[in-house]
Amino acid sequence: LAGTDAPTPRDRWRARCAGLRAWAGANPQEYALLYGSPVPGYAAPPDTLDPATRVYVALAEPLRGVTAAVEERVVTGPLAADGARMAEALGLPLPPERAVRLLGAWATLFGLVSLELFGHTHNVVTDHDTFFAYHVDALADRLGL
């Protein structure tokens, strides 16, 4: 698992994000199958859900035991319930606000990888390594890492 031995939570976050990007670049068909357009009418068998969530658990791990150094926007109602459910599913003692923020970070991360992998930043971004690293660090800031 990328970043397991990294000295800080931020370094683990960086390593795991970079690992996801590297894997996607080396395995674009598999990435597209897992994270691309869903097949209409397809429902994944229940026994595939645990393996499918491993990447999310790995990306969430750097937050374990870290107290957010950022001001959390309060979430209420269904969004708070979603955040609490997500934190419980990950086995992380995160407040709902932090879990919701983590989900937004995942959405951004997978968006960055997908846009690059499928050529949607062609002629816009000339240095994808720097662009990706910049946004990974911005997400780390947002997560309080």
Task: Tell where the protein language model's regions lie, with residue ranges.
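Hydrophobic alpha-helical connector segments
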Residues: L1-E30, L49-Y56
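Short, surface-exposed loop/turn segments at secondary-structure junctions
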Residues: G3-R10, Y42, T121-V125
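Alpha-helix initiation/capping motif
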Residues: A6, P45-T48, A52, R98, ...
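Solvent-exposed, charged amphipathic helical/linker segments at domain boundaries
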Residues: G36-T48
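C-terminal peripheral helix-coil segments that are non-catalytic and often amphipathic
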Residues: V57-L145
